[in-house]
């Protein structure tokens, strides 16, 4: 189920519209996405604008990935699928805002891919072909007995 509403940081005109706050809804429960992002080796956004409504979920993650002292073990593969060049530029503006203007460090510290699904040449792109090939390799790896044996060790 989806709960639509406004974020806690937005003024509700002296509380008159507090009922519209997501967190005030009795059916609202949030998933601690920040922990998942911190632990993930790879993060994929598909069709997500990273806009203002969800900004607070992702800003700490993107800020951390732009730190100058980021250790190699904290490097992430971050892949964003969007529709076209206009939406890609909107996402770039949002990322620039989220990370205090350190967008170049986001590329430097991580494997950052932004793919436009509306681009008819997407499948020809070397970076997309590499990303896709890596996903196929990972799918094959998790289908092996060794993968399950390794999980059982923990």
Name each model feature, range by range.
Residues 31-154:
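SIR2/sirtuin-family catalytic core signature
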């Amino acid at each position: 189920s989806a709960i639509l509403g406004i974020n806690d940081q937005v003024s509700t005109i002296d509380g008159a519209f507090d009922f519209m706050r997501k967190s005030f809804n009795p059916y609202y429960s949030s998933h601690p996405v920040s922990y998942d992002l911190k632990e993930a080796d790879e993060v994929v956004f598909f069709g997500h604008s990273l806009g203002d409504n969800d900004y607070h979920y992702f800003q700490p993650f993107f800020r951390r990935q732009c730190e100058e002292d980021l250790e190699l073990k904290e490097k992430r593969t971050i892949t964003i699928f969007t529709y076209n060049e206009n939406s890609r530029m909107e996402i770039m503006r949002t990322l620039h805002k989220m990370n205090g203007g350190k967008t170049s460090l986001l590329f430097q510290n991580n494997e950052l891919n932004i793919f436009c699904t509306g681009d008819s040449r997407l499948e020809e792109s070397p970076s997309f072909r590499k990303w896709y090939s890596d996903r196929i390799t990972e799918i094959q790896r998790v289908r092996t007995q060794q993968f399950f044996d390794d999980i059982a060790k923990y």
